[in-house]
Regions:
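Glycine-rich portal/gate segments that line the openings of hydrophobic small-molecule binding cavities
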Residues: 30, 40-88, 103, 107
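A short, basic/flexible loop-to-alpha-helix module at the beginning of a structural domain
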Residues: 145-158
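N-terminal Rossmann NAD(P)H-binding glycine-rich loop of SDR-like oxidoreductase domains
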Residues: 159-180
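Conserved glycine-rich Rossmann-like NAD(P)H-binding loop of the short-chain dehydrogenase/reductase
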Residues: 182-189
Length: 202
């Protein structure tokens, strides 16, 4: 089966460096993950720079699986690229492209090259995969644009203590604040992980 290409492009009303930095922060993956396809982060080493890896558990087309991706290219304010090391696709490369549009706006494009895990007669499964990608990336771009619109209203970064940070609302609040550049301290009822932004509450 040939490699397919999916692209989604949006114009965002923030400078290109702010758009790129948002992607590099903790919380970005969690923020752009649609609620119908929840992701559980298992392990992360590094950020979005070349050599960084991320492993998580998720579902695509309602099929659960573990996914591991490695970042293989990085040019600040221009692009970063990750490829599937382990997961459901025969091939998957995701290139995140950025370009300035004047001083106060930028274009971003998600370009995915993918190959389904097995050969299927006809194009029904392929069309289903493209439809799901279109739905997911429409959601991702909308959330990113809305978050950046709010974050760009102030340059002040603050420290926030969050209780209930592991719940549905709390986990999204933590991701939203971190992706916006704020420091978040999670109030936890267990012993804090050494070196983490956690505070024990008994």
């Amino acid at each position: 089966m040939p490699v397919s290409i999916f692209e989604k492009e949006s114009r965002v009303n923030v400078p290109v460096d702010a758009l790129f930095q948002w992607h590099a922060r903790q919380g970005a993956i969690e923020r752009v993950t649609p609620p119908w396809a929840p992701v559980k982060l298992i392990r992360r080493s590094g950020g979005i720079e070349t050599g960084a890896r991320v492993r998580f558990r998720l579902a695509f087309l309602k099929i659960p699986f573990e996914w591991e991706a490695e970042h293989v290219a990085y040019e600040e304010n221009r692009l970063f690229m990750d490829r599937q090391v382990r997961g459901p696709f025969r091939h998957w490369t995701h290139t995140h492209l950025f370009a300035p549009d004047g001083e106060d706006a930028a274009w971003m494009k998600d370009r995915i090259e993918f190959q389904l895990p097995f050969d299927v007669p006809g194009r029904r499964l392929h069309r289903l995969a493209e439809k799901e990608l279109d739905r997911m990336f429409a959601y991702r771009h909308r959330v990113l644009e809305n978050d950046l619109a709010v974050h760009s209203r102030t340059l002040k970064r603050i420290t926030v203590l969050v209780s209930g940070a592991s719940g549905v609302i709390g986990s999204q609040l933590v991701a939203y604040l971190r992706a916006g550049g704020h420091r978040v301290i999670r109030l936890v009822r267990r012993r804090p992980v050494p070196g983490s932004d956690e505070l024990y509450w008994n």
